[in-house]
């Protein structure tokens, strides 16, 4: 499987960020909806797979669920969609390279976040609630338990957990930029995403599905949901824009530019 060098991945990420800014509004709206829906479908698959497993399996059942969750991000990357957590890295890198403005970044992040929320709520309401995929038997119990675990954490703990989450998610996106074929992209995405789910980190878009799914089932409140989403979003920004985007921009983009300048001098 062909794979780009890190400095080439950095340039690919910056180029991807610029392309995201240039998307026409109708495309951005539709792709943002799909991004939220795809992640929600991945989480729904997770719940349906592990909901009926024996409790005695303990963390093994969590690992099995984590192993199927990456389907969501694979759909985002290969089928095409806009996901705010990935944009926190690529669009930020375009900003760091001075190819876009802060205003353009803010507009992109705002629209994609709103559409991700709508997509995730769509899956939670129509598939989870109306069809009953998260509201019957052990699946309801699992949905509520997962949502409870997200909501029980303090603001600070959610924020820190979200940093770790998007560090791994954006590393998955980074690896997908590096791979030059579908198999390589799938492999690059799979393991970092499986890791964040198995660990139990906080992902803002995933939470936009699982917490509302529990709310539609009669548990928790929208106020609790908002109280979770705010620190999860902030932490995801730090994890994606700083721990991946900024660090790799410093490590590889400037180094690449200095090499070009040295060649011009020589």
UniProtKB/Swiss-Prot annotation:
Entry keywords, A to Z: Cell membrane, Membrane, Transmembrane, Transmembrane helix, Transport
Gene3D superfamilies named among the record's database cross-references: Glycerol uptake facilitator protein
Gene Ontology cellular-component annotations: plasma membrane
InterPro entries: Aquaporin-like (IPR023271), For/NO2_transpt (IPR000292), For/NO2_transpt_CS (IPR024002)
Bilayer topology annotation: Multi-pass membrane protein
Transmembrane segments: 25-45, 64-84, 111-131, 158-178, 186-206, 209-229, 230-250
Molecular function GO labels: formate transmembrane transporter activity
Pfam families: Form_Nir_trans
Localization per Swiss-Prot or TrEMBL: Cell membrane
GO biological process: formate transport
Top-level taxon: Bacteria
NCBIfam families: fnt
Family indicated by similarity: Belongs to the FNT transporter (TC 1.A.16) family.
Protein name: Uncharacterized transporter YrhG
């Amino acid at each position: 499987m062909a794979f780009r060098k890190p400095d080439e991945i950095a340039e690919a990420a910056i180029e991807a960020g610029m392309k995201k800014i240039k998307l026409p509004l109708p495309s951005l709206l539709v792709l943002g909806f799909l991004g939220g829906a795809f992640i929600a479908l991945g989480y729904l698959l997770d719940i349906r797979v592990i909901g009926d497993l024996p409790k005695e399996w303990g963390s093994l059942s969590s690992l099995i669920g984590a192993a199927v969750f990456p389907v969501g991000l694979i759909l985002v990357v290969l089928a095409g969609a806009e996901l705010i957590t990935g944009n926190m890295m690529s669009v930020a890198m375009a900003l760091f390279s001075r190819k876009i403005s802060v205003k353009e970044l803010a507009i992109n992040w705002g629209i994609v976040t709103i559409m991700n929320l709508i997509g995730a709520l769509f899956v939670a309401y129509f598939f989870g609630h109306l069809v009953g995929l998260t509201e019957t038997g052990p699946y309801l119990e699992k949905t509520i338990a997962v949502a409870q675990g997200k909501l029980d954490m303090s603001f600070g703990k959610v924020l820190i957990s979200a940093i770790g989450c998007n560090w791994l998610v954006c590393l998955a996106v980074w690896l997908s930029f590096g791979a030059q074929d579908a198999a390589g992209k799938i492999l690059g995405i799979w393991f970092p995403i499986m890791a964040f789910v198995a660990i139990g980190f906080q992902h803002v878009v995933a939470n936009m599905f699982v917490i509302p799914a529990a709310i539609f089932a009669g548990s928790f409140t929208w106020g609790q949901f908002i109280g979770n989403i705010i620190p999860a979003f902030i932490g995801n920004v730090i994890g994606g824009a700083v721990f991946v985007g900024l660090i790799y921009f410093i490590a590889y983009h400037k180094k690449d530019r200095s090499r070009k300048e040295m060649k011009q001098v020589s």
